[in-house]
A protein has these predicted regions:
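Short catalytic/signature loops enriched in Gly
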Residues: 2-7, 20-27, 32, 249-329
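Helix-to-loop junction immediately C-terminal to a conserved catalytic motif
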Residues: 67
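Conserved ABC transporter NBD signature motif
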Residues: 75-83, 95
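Conserved ABC ATPase "signature" region
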Residues: 83, 128, 136-156, 265
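Conserved ABC ATPase signature
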Residues: 161-165, 169
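A short, proline-enriched helix->beta-strand linker immediately N-terminal to the Walker B motif
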Residues: 180-184
């Protein structure tokens, strides 16, 4: 059992339900969609938890709900021991300075009308105006220069605008902005997926260096298993708003338990033909859609510890396993 002091973020039974559709006069076409189905996980201090899954599985919704950009339908989000779902707006603003987000697309996440200086100093200015983190102009200027050095950006860039930079430079600017308030936890939403492969490695290495230097914790989400493997200490596998498996990186890749995890790992491209994995689940199969509606519900299939630090849900376990066996024959 881990000491609570070693846990910076703890999510318990988090549910996020959205209502979609439209009303027009007497015609109503609305339905509820569960984007998150009672997920639970922990992020340890100075460590990285990778959250992996296909597009649309609920990864980004998880981060936005943790940040309270979407208020959760139910469940708890403990950050440094405080339940964020019960905080007032003022208390939430104070808490958010220790938890910041790096967004997926550096092209759209930076205001094109602001200079780099204005973008990076904006969090400092806002928290100064709200008297949460008072700073003089000189202190703000000093902090901006520190952030430029930390993220490998030249000070000569400060008076320029986002459109003048490459994707990699823009993401460095986004990281500098996220670090402005000296947070303890970064939520990284597909932080390198929009970048060229050559630039991707540079940003990942920068994040690793910053984690060591600043004692940061990361919740790192991606659909790319290779990237998650490189960055993470532990990995959680998500499917349709449900976490199916959590394990340390080495264990997850060497001994995956849930059939969905197995098929994700099998989907990683392999150069050596002798190592090519043949057992996969066709996720668009009609039978999978059917069993998703008739299977054991996520609420009745919590994560269970099958070995030390290795947790697996029974949700869709037997059904997906039968598809694996079917595809093998």
């Amino acid at each position: 059992m881990k000491n609570e002091k070693d846990i910076i973020l703890k999510v318990e039974n988090l549910v996020q339900t959205f209502t979609i559709g439209e009303d027009f006069l007497f015609w109503k076409n609305k339905r509820k969609v569960n984007a998150l189905n009672g997920i639970s996980f922990e992020v340890e201090r100075n460590k990285t938890l990778g959250l992996v899954g296909e597009s649309g599985c609920g990864k980004s919704t998880t981060l936005r709900t943790i940040m309270q950009l979407h208020r959760p339908t139910s469940g708890s989000i403990y950050f440094n021991g405080k339940d964020m779902t019960k905080l007032s707006k003022r208390e939430l603003l104070k808490t958010r300075k220790d938890m910041q987000m790096v967004f997926q697309d550096p092209h759209t996440s930076l205001n094109p009308r602001m200079t780099i200086r204005e973008i990076i100093e904006e969090p400092l200015v806002i928290y100064n105006e709200n008297k949460i983190l008072p700073k003089t102009k000189q202190e703000i200027e000093k902090r901006v220069n520190e952030l430029m050095n930390l993220t490998g950006l030249a000070k000569s860039m400060l008076s320029r605008y986002p459109h003048e930079f490459s994707g990699g430079q823009r993401q460095r600017i986004g990281i500098a902005r996220a670090l402005a308030l000296n947070p303890k936890l970064l939520l990284l939403d597909e932080a390198v997926s929009a970048l060229d492969v050559s630039i991707r490695a540079q940003i990942l290495n920068l994040l690793k260096d910053l984690q060591k230097e600043l004692s940061l914790s990361y919740l790192f989400i991606s659909h790319d298993l290779a990237v998650v493997k490189y960055m993470s200490d532990k990995i959680a596998v998500m499917y349709m708003g449900v976490i199916l498996e959590i394990a340390p990186r080495e264990i997850l890749f060497s001994n995956p338990k849930h059939p969905y995890t197995k098929t994700l790992i099998a989907s990683i491209p392999e150069i050596d033909p002798e190592k090519i994995k043949t057992k996969t689940i066709k996720l668009d199969e009609p039978s999978l859609t059917t069993i998703r509606n008739t299977s054991l519900t996520p609420e009745n299939a919590p994560l269970e510890e099958v070995e030390k630090d290795h947790f697996v849900s029974k949700y869709l376990f037997d059904e997906m396993n039968s598809l694996l066996n079917k595809n093998e024959t």
